[in-house]
């Protein structure tokens, strides 16, 4: 039996593509464009795992498909190479993070090339290259000039073990850091912030213009968190102080029985009475040690301290106590709330805990038992009594504005983006602080501000980055003799990834970020494929920067990514014992189809789980390529199931994909190829072209492969294979298995040219209609023959054909035919005696 040798075929074609720059981006202005983008990887020391190629294979199939359909295709790859892991490695080993990063990139690139992806490597970008981050810094200076980058003393999420502050989005629900799982504490520090909040409404509205999964849009909508309501001003009794609260339910103001300020609220110290001062100070100290997520956890016990002061409820003049509690955040809304315990669960729990008044203002519910959080007509609410929710809100806002104690207000949950990091391995922020108290951006002519090479990259411990130790870089003097100090904070890893898709369009431009005409030609990105874990962070930040650049006239589109697709996760295999504990794969043996613990002999349960080093279930693509070939890996990952589903890795599935490709190879290389068309494969061939074309376009790659299998099965039943159908089939399979596609194309054409730009096959609509049908012939109710006849024969014609059949004649010889019942396109029933 013939098998193809992937170890010879695959390197041969990879070399051919590289030598001939086969995938150089097309520039023919008469052709339509297609921009296929992968989320570029962080080049870790571990290298690629089999999860990476799933998304990469999908965009590669689309790119190859679109090239064959006559598009100019931009399909680039690069490296998101700044970030904590390289710096941590450098601190642990004493090596330069730049060297470590370069080694990792070389390894990633080797692995990616071994998988046969059709990237235009002339456009490769690396976020740590000064020629690249010159433009990251340039964007920052534009943000600074527009007032969108500013410094503020803010409570940050400080991670002692990482020596840096992290963004809210990088804190996990359990209050630990996303990177490393370390404790996060709140600490006031001077930080650079980006005013993403200015763009909140546009970030929300423009989600309507993009073809993204609704789940991702919802995550962004929730993160932006638009609320429409009212600001209400409360005076503090016996003082000239007041505070403002934002509420989405101003109609419940009559039910506000206490107010709560965030422990960090500027008013707290001023209104705290002497006898409460110690308790308040102690509570503030405890709150400062908790992350925002820990403080707002709905399940946690309610804590708080009374300030000793009262506020006046503006609508009824009642005195209400003012408390501080950590579930109110200074950074959210106004940092103060009015509490309506009768109709809010958290306020109700707090009121019960501290024995505060609970007054219902909506009818329906027993507020002694629980908060009533549904809608009802208003009660105990003066001029709002008897009104429904919408009417009452409108009337209360009108009253607040007329009385000068409030106004209608729209707020957002979104906070400004904490942009600085106290680490070495990141883009230097191009700002100089002068001794006269002013700060200026580094002029464009002096960009890039290059990260200095230094051995001393440990955090300074003072809250500044290690750059504070590099004095010859740090200290500068102006022409007028004024001394200055460079900004020591660096940018977060999100900076370089917020605009990289733009640089791919014009990667070698030294004069500007990218040429306007090229940006007009290629934007927006047509398909962006990557993991759903980037729903809020990267995608929101990239959209924000894109809108700033749109306002500056740099980019021609409002949105960067027209279509987004999230591939599923490839799960590994895990094993659990009777206690539910996970067992590493090297401690498992298979016997008679079951799995057992090597040491204890206990039978284990097999189940899918995320691949992890600790479970030793990570599959390295290098091993798969060596044993089965890259084409097998590509076909298997696309055939596992729908691209957006999470599916467990299976060695059996991999073997099945390899067997299929061997069958394809044998079909084309051993079957007699003929220039004459017998017509036997007309229908299945045209069905296959139609199905694969439509399904690739819709990214339904698993069903496209299934249809290719249908064709192979049908073709194998024939003695000969029509040349046009052989070539067309090879073209259809080439995007999935490109090395095999090239090899078989040469076997059929000997053209010496790549299959990549051969026009995509078309199908004949008329051949999709079945011209023949199979009918059964029954004698005495038993099937005696099956006949293929022309479709839509009349009853008489059908009867004639059936009675002329040899098998039928043998059955009815010497018998009397009582009746013949013919049903067109289905059957002939012969009754004999």
Swiss-Prot record:
Q: What reaction does this catalyse?
A: tRNA(Leu) + L-leucine + ATP = L-leucyl-tRNA(Leu) + AMP + diphosphate
Pfam family example for this protein? Answer: tRNA-synt_1
What SUPFAM superfamilies does its record include?
Anticodon-binding domain of a subclass of class I aminoacyl-tRNA synthetases, Nucleotidylyl transferase, ValRS/IleRS/LeuRS editing domain
One Gene Ontology cellular component term attached to this UniProt record is: cytosol
Motif 'HIGH' region: list the residue ranges. Answer: 41-52
Q: Any idea where this protein resides?
A: Cytoplasm
Q: Which UniProt keywords apply?
A: Aminoacyl-tRNA synthetase, ATP-binding, Cytoplasm, Ligase, Nucleotide-binding, Protein biosynthesis
Q: Which InterPro entries match?
A: aa-tRNA-synth_I_CS, aa-tRNA-synth_Ia, Leu-tRNA-ligase, Leu_tRNA-synth_edit, M/V/L/I-tRNA-synth_anticd-bd, Methionyl/Leucyl_tRNA_Synth, Rossmann-like_a/b/a_fold, tRNAsynth_Ia_anticodon-bd
A GO molecular-function annotation? aminoacyl-tRNA deacylase activity
Which parts of the sequence bind ATP?
A: 613
Q: Which GO terms describe its biological process?
A: leucyl-tRNA aminoacylation
> Would the keyword Disulfide bond turn up in this protein's UniProt record?
no
- What superkingdom heads the lineage? Bacteria
Question: Where's the motif 'KMSKS' region?
Answer: 610-614
- The EC number(s) attached to this protein equal 6.1.1.4
**HAMAP family (UniProt xref):** Leu_tRNA_synth_B
Mind telling me which PANTHER family this protein's record contains? LEUCINE--TRNA LIGASE, MITOCHONDRIAL, LEUCYL-TRNA SYNTHETASE
* Entry similarity comment: Belongs to the class-I aminoacyl-tRNA synthetase family.
Its protein name is Leucine--tRNA ligase
The gene behind this protein is leuS
